[in-house]
Amino acid sequence: MLFSGSITYPKTVQTAANGTFDMSNYNGLTYEITAEKGGDYLNGVSTLDLVMIQRHILGLQALDSNYKLIAADANNDGKVTASDLTDLRKLILGVTTALPNNTSWKFPVAGTSVGTSPITCVELIEIENLSADKVNQNFVAVKIGDVNGNVSTSVNSPEVESRSNANVEMSVAEASIAAGEVVEIPVTADNFSEVSGFQYTMNLNGASLVGVQSGVLEVNANNVGVISDNVVTMSYASTEAVNANEGAVLFTLTVKADKAMKVSEMISLNSEVTRAESYNSDLKVGKVSLGVRTAPVAGIELFQNEPNPFKGMTTVSFEMPEAATATLSVYDVTGKVVTVRNINAIKGLNSEIFTKDQLGVSGVLYYTLVSGDFTATKKMIIVE
């Protein structure tokens, strides 16, 4: 955009496909040139950017260029803080479609310095008394929020993201839910190694989200976007890579069923709003999936502990179709193993008694029964 003291200005020209621009017949005046591009806020922005910005804020891995500092300053206050993460996460989750205090792009003048404390840049070229052609009046395009450089434009191909085969695999247990019932659905780890973050869109067919609770992963309402009754988005970013044992509860979804259904009929992941992907410790991009565990036809069944909650003692029971070995493990909400019992289970009903003194903790615990290919997890609560 070209500005001048003349009443015929400002004038605007569109750049060519390769990013060049040309203005003519403007001799003899003093001009100011700026560049701008609106919209497309989410282009190049993902939870991977949140991971990198978090590491920068905590001093674990600094952003390696001043242009990336401009990109990370999402709320345009001259510094990179947790507030920038909040604005970008809402964008990623689909809660907002624009940044409230910033444009989608900034265009520092090429060759000018970028201030870092506070973050500032020169976005205007001034030409006094133009009397001859001026060439190489260039700007640097900075996509706000995109610190890993994967924005897609017509000028340059985006930086190729490193792909990983280390995908995030999670699962939930099959169960029947009655119409109007509010249930807790633990999301457990199937393959969860060296994970720095993930994001996805979840469809809840015939159900609505009530809340989300932490397990191994510290999550809260800020990690979730409720787009509609049936569509929920999630974004999780960690400053350090997370490992979780198979069967460990990563987090728990609380949902309300609008009709009678099975969990397998209700939950599925896709990229409808927030693209489904994961990131490992090397910041490589992989897939994220959510499976549904079904009990084998033989009919092993793990029951809810009784009583629950409990103060002194509780009993965990399970049904076995045949005599077999089984492992009953108790975890805390971080995934740390509290106790493990190796059991020579008999055909029929088996019961194990746990006391508060044996467990040595209070609050929320999870217990998992494993026998052959069967795995099931339930929650117990110890009160003071």
Model-derived segments and spans:
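Acidic carboxylate motifs that coordinate Ca2+ or other divalent cations, activating on Asp/Glu
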Residues: 75-77
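Short Pro-Gly-centered beta-turn/loop motif in secreted/extracellular proteins
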Residues: 22-30
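Acidic, low-complexity intrinsically disordered segments
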Residues: 6, 30, 41-44, 51, ...
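Short, surface-exposed loop/turn motifs with a glycine/proline- and acidic-biased composition
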Residues: 315, 342-373
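Aromatic/hydrophobic beta-strand junction motif of beta-rich domains
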Residues: 185-189, 314-320, 354
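Short, glycine-anchored, charge-dense loop/turn motifs used at functional sites
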Residues: 305-306, 330-338, 365
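Short, acidic Ser/Thr/Gly-rich low-complexity loop/linker segments typical of extracellular
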Residues: 6-22
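Short beta-strand edge segments in extracellular beta-sheet folds
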Residues: 344, 380-384
